[in-house]
Amino acid sequence: MADVTVKQLAQVVGIPVERLLNQLQEAGLSFTDDQQTVNEEQKRILLNHLKGSSNRDISAAPERITLRRKSMSQVTVGHDMHSGKTVNIEVRKKKTFIKRSAIPEQAEVEEPVVPPVVEEPVHEEITVVSEVSAETPELKETEEHPVIEPVAELDETVKEEEKINSEENTAESQDELTHANTDVIENLVDVVEETIPVSKKEEVKPEKVSKKKHLEQTDSDISEFKKGKKKPKYHTFEHDEEEQELHRRGGRSKFKKKKGTEKSDKYREAEETLTHGFALPTAPIVREVLIPETITVAELAKRMSVKAAEVIKVMMSLGAMATINQVIDQETSVIVVEEMGHKPIIIKEDAVETGLGEAISKGTKTEGRAPVVTIMGHVDHGKTSLLDYIRRTKVAAGEAGGITQHIGAYHVSTPKGNITFLDTPGHAAFTAMRARGAQATDIVILIVAADDGVKPQTIEAIQHAKAAKVPIIVAINKMDKPDADPERVMNELSVQEVIPEAWGGDTMFVNISAKSGMGIDDLLDAILLQSEVLELKAVTDGAAKGVVIESRLDKGRGPVATVLVQSGTLHKGDILLAGFQYGRVRALVSDNGDLVDSAGPSIPVEVLGLSAIPHAGDEAVVVPDEKKAREVALFRQGRFRDVKLARRQKTTIEGIMENMTATESKVLNIVLKADVQGSLEAISDALTKLSTDEVKVDVISSGVGGITESDVHLAIASNAILIGFNVRADGTAKRLAEQESVSIHYYSVIYDIVDQIKGALTGMLAPQFKEEIVGIAEVRDVFKSPKIGAIAGCMVIEGVVKRNNPIRVLRSNVVIYEGTLESLRRFKDDVLEVRQGFECGIGVKNYNDVKPGDLIEVFETVEIKRDL
């Protein structure tokens, strides 16, 4: 606090200006005007002066005060009120108050405990006017505590009482002065402590000595003191707490012994301490609960101030099972919080991600960039052949089976401009790869074969392009074939809301032939025209930012990621963060296989130097240093693990019943290795979709790279099928597989994997049986046989009745028995079967209650061929 005037200081302290001036002068400071400035040193001098005067006032106060009181009363002594005699009794009371500082303290300073006190036997002379004998009854001696200081005798003179009265008046005046000074000191200490802290040694808190208050509230203070509620300033020695009427009967009187120990006082004090002053809320308390992406049940209950058992009950009522330490996801947490009547607040723990965005240097130089074009369409409609013609290479011949199974990223320089092409797979298994291609592109070229028309993958490609809000250019391929019908293609595409410009729409249609090269130049012109309309621009300086198109594990080079740079410039030696992985860029390889030092916007390059294989579709950014990259990567890995665990543990009651029955279902374990990450995801997804309620496909391990010894060990331990897609096993893995009789299946086309796994699952299906009724016989009469029992004489009214087949006995179309046909005879001969229209005798095994009119239904069980 800065220097203030005397007037301002008086207002802060809360006393009149004249009084503050007097106190300043008493402290030795020359102040006469209220506009004079008081600095910090003068405030300290005034504070020390007031503390000293307070201490003197306290020391001047008497250390012990004795209070005496007399009271007169009349008591009737006798058998009744009329014949009894009245006795005048004088009762004297004496109470002594001793200052606490005069008694040695035995407890801690912070919370002093009342020292034990002993009351010496005191004799009171009582004048009794009656005819009763003048004997003084004996009073029992009270020894409540060990002796500390004897109490003065009560046979003192009236002068001492007057002296006490004068002491009381003096104490009252001193108390008023002390109280006033104390208030001033407290206010002044607050002012001084704003800038200069006062040490504990300098702090002196004067005790308030007020005799009048003690004398007025004696009874309440003593009762509170006994209960342990209050520690009085003075020790009270009370000789006659309860009025004891003493008659002069001779002898000496002693006080009654008061039973009460120090231990019981402590218990009373503890009970008083444990009682709280809070009232039970009458209205429900609605709390704002912060919910992160994952949270345990115990932590969620703590944030709602309820027990974890209550949260578990609510989750069970909602159909979800959980334990107190289980991690639940954000969606489940929000439902639980709302169900319990609180307000959920969703928070995103992305402080690290936000810091990453701030740390990335952003460029300012903007230039035009080449368009990124994705070629989409159905299988074998000529996507890669078109790109092959444009690049003048043989890409299609290099793909297994002639179909594309990777995302190919190529940068093509044409006489009219540069274009970056992304070639996506066309078959259904690569939906995720195709979706990633649409998200990273500017223009989509939809290839449709003129002789085949619109197919399911064609429709799916249209949906991806519309979802990404990317313009479409339709290329009608295979126009060199004689059965080409472009009008049919246009009609089918118009159904999918792709209207050609010739029909008044906004989609360009180009007729081409990837084999002969017809219309290729027109297609390139359409692409460049569309890019000019889009006005594609990107920042060329600053940190690079892009997307991972594909990734793989290359033998000798390690993890390799194909990155399409979208903004900035990627240099060799930069620290690149891609999803969960990071690393220093050791080399940049162009799509032609050349080593380059940098890559600008719309340029695809292969990056070497990452710590592991990133996921296709992950965002790749250049960060300032490796420390920041490691921090963000570890944060993402931890968050991904928590979210995955929460989703895995989200078990419903229905799921528990499924798991109970799932033990009976058969599982086909698979260890899968592929050459690139995108193919691995597509194969794993396609195989998982083959699962049914009876048989399941479990990809227990999947990875990018060759088959190693650890993969073979895992397949042996889990009894799994080992599949390699465009990869081979090393020598150690081959030898181990031969020793353990583990077969390794190699594939280069995804359809072959799906077909073989589907066949294996079909063989694992449990056989299904169907009952077929082969014949029905009507009972006409019943005969008794001593060997078999009841024999039913029947007429075969439908089909054929065969011996040893299972049968059912029907009475009024109700099945009353199911068993086996034991005996079948025609006349007296045993026969194997009886056809429709013939009579026969039928003996039912272990059943004799056959009556005329019953129907005997003969059936057999037939196995049905199962299929997925």
Swiss-Prot record:
Biased composition, class Basic residues, residue ranges: 249-260
Biased composition (Basic and acidic residues): 156-166, 199-209
A Pfam cross-reference name: GTP_EFTU_D2
Subcellular location as annotated: Cytoplasm
Function: One of the essential components for the initiation of protein synthesis. Protects formylmethionyl-tRNA from spontaneous hydrolysis and promotes its binding to the 30S ribosomal subunits. Also involved in the hydrolysis of GTP during the formation of the 70S ribosomal complex.
Region (G4): 477-480
Residues the entry annotates as binding GTP: 377-384, 423-427, 477-480
Protein name: Translation initiation factor IF-2
Region (G3): 423-426
Residues of the tr-type G domain: 368-537
Region (G2): 402-406
Ranges for region G5: 513-515
Domain of life: Bacteria
Chain positions covered by the region annotation Disordered: 156-177, 199-269
Chain segments carrying region G1: 377-384
Keyword presence, Phosphoprotein: no
GO CC annotations on file: cytosol
InterPro entries found in the cross-reference section: DNA-bd_dom_put_sf, EF-G-like_DII, EFTu-like_2, IF2_assoc_dom_bac, IF2_II, IF2_N, P-loop_NTPase, Small_GTP-bd
GO molecular function: GTP binding; GTPase activity; guanosine tetraphosphate binding; translation initiation factor activity
Family: Belongs to the TRAFAC class translation factor GTPase superfamily. Classic translation factor GTPase family. IF-2 subfamily.
Keywords, comma-separated and alphabetical: Cytoplasm, GTP-binding, Initiation factor, Nucleotide-binding, Protein biosynthesis
